[in-house]
């Protein structure tokens, strides 16, 4: 199966966008999952709901909210451009942001479930033996949560690969800049004679998703085996 240059461009851009989206959202995913599991504070239920909103909102709505907040004239985007010269709307950076926002709830949910399975008594025992909060987190909590972190990361990566609605609303469908696999397929489907190209990208998407899930299962199994030793 031979891809054309524009198709390769879409595949490579999708991999770049998905990888960066996961890379930048992972620290926040771990933090918010830990916050929801280990802390009690006013507004916790509200925070939980806000974090999971992208799962239930139409992607176009999320893209519109990003556009009005992070666009050149948005209340956040305008300041980012004036102070740092950074723009998100209609650029690959915006595609990364849209993918990160849409995939974030899946990441948080997987990590949260793993954290809920960690025995709090292990952390308490380490604290009574003199270990500090950060040392307990990095030597006990994080290693025991690693399988969930891996699963959440791969799920977020796979979700980012398939992101379309928020992306096309926020950053449009610019070849070489924001045209990811779903956007390229959308264009090809609407183009006479583009069915074969859309089919090739469809096969690539399925293959990437399957590979991601298989790698996730393999890494999670290795992590569980090491944690059980």
UniProtKB/Swiss-Prot annotation:
Database matches in CDD domains: TM_PBP2
Q: Name one GO cellular component term.
A: membrane
Residues annotated as transmembrane: 17-37, 50-70, 84-104, 137-157, 202-222
Tell me where it resides. Cell inner membrane
The source's domain of life comes to Bacteria
Q: Keyword 4Fe-4S on this protein?
A: no
Give residue ranges on the Cytoplasmic side: 38-49, 105-136, 223-229
Please indicate if the UniProt record lists Cell membrane as a keyword.
yes
Keywords (alphabetical) are: Cell inner membrane, Cell membrane, Membrane, Molybdenum, Transmembrane, Transmembrane helix, Transport
In what residue span(s) does the ABC transmembrane type-1 domain sit?
11-219
Which residues are exposed on the Periplasmic face of the membrane?
Answer: 1-16, 71-83, 158-201
**What Pfam families does UniProt report for this protein, alphabetically?**
BPD_transp_1
Q: Name one GO biological process term.
A: molybdate ion transport
PROSITE patterns found in the cross-reference section: ABC_TM1
**Leader sequence segment:** none
What's its membrane topology? Multi-pass membrane protein
What molecular functions are annotated in GO for this chain?
Answer: molybdate ion transmembrane transporter activity
The UniProt function text for this chain reads: Part of the binding-protein-dependent transport system for molybdenum; probably responsible for the translocation of the substrate across the membrane.
Q: Which family does it belong to?
A: Belongs to the binding-protein-dependent transport system permease family. CysTW subfamily.
Supply the name of the protein.
Answer: Molybdenum transport system permease protein ModB
Specify the species: Escherichia coli (strain K12)
Q: What is the lineage of its organism?
A: Bacteria, Pseudomonadati, Pseudomonadota, Gammaproteobacteria, Enterobacterales
Gene expressing this chain: modB
